[in-house]
Amino acid sequence: SLRTVNAYNDFQKSVYPMLTYSSRFFILRSKKERQEKNMVYAFMADGCEEVEALAVIDLLRRAGEEVELVSIHNKDMTQGSHGIGIKNDVMLKDIFVDAADTLFLPGGGVGTKNLKACEELSKLLVSHNAKGGRIAAICAAPSALGILGILEGKNATCYPGFEDQLKGAKFKAVPVVTDGNITTSRGMGTSILLGLELVKLLKDEETSKKLAEAIMMP
């Protein structure tokens, strides 16, 4: 009936603003909570190399670090380069990044192209680097830092074929390179080494060594 329809419309008008406010409050509260702890944000792009992402995330979480998977596409699931779906924790538009946080870029050819195409992420990387914030990238992803000038004067490594995109960097053909606030690595086969390096940097060397032993690292 018309009376029922009007009653339902009145209900929508009264409840929807409350839901909207509640959602905004949750986001703000989440940002405030994140300010109180050092975070690692892994930026997930469609076409990313799944092992490079998850090996590093897994090791950091084992070490007790707070890690969130951030969708640069602002959607719940990331589709990896080999058809593996990965559930994200948060959207890029909703995160709060402190200078003490760490930003991590998994590689993959298509994934790296998507990282480079994300203007919001590019601005965040430049800003974070200017504050001395830690940034890590693996495989093709260091090239996303290179085109932004973040590797200028730094020692760095990457997947073969991307060396010319490490603008201003001194290329090192080794598995993992840390130079100041920037850590880079070569590819899927070095992803565990990258994870252990970040554990050493964010936690301590002893924790990194214990983790290496626990996972039977040769």
For the regions a language model picked out, list residue spans one by one.
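A cross-family phosphate/adenosyl-ligand binding-site feature
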Residues: G80-D89
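Acidic, Ala/Val/Gly-enriched low-complexity intrinsically disordered segments
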Residues: V5-D10, V15, E33
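Short N-terminal binding/cap micro-motifs at the start of the first secondary-structure element
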Residues: C48-A53, M77
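Active-site-adjacent pocket-lining segments in enzyme domains
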Residues: M39-E49, L59-S71, N88-P218
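Short, positively charged and aromatic/hydrophobic N-terminal segments
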Residues: Y8, Y16-T20, I27
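NAD(P)-binding Rossmann-fold cofactor-contacting core
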Residues: V70-T78
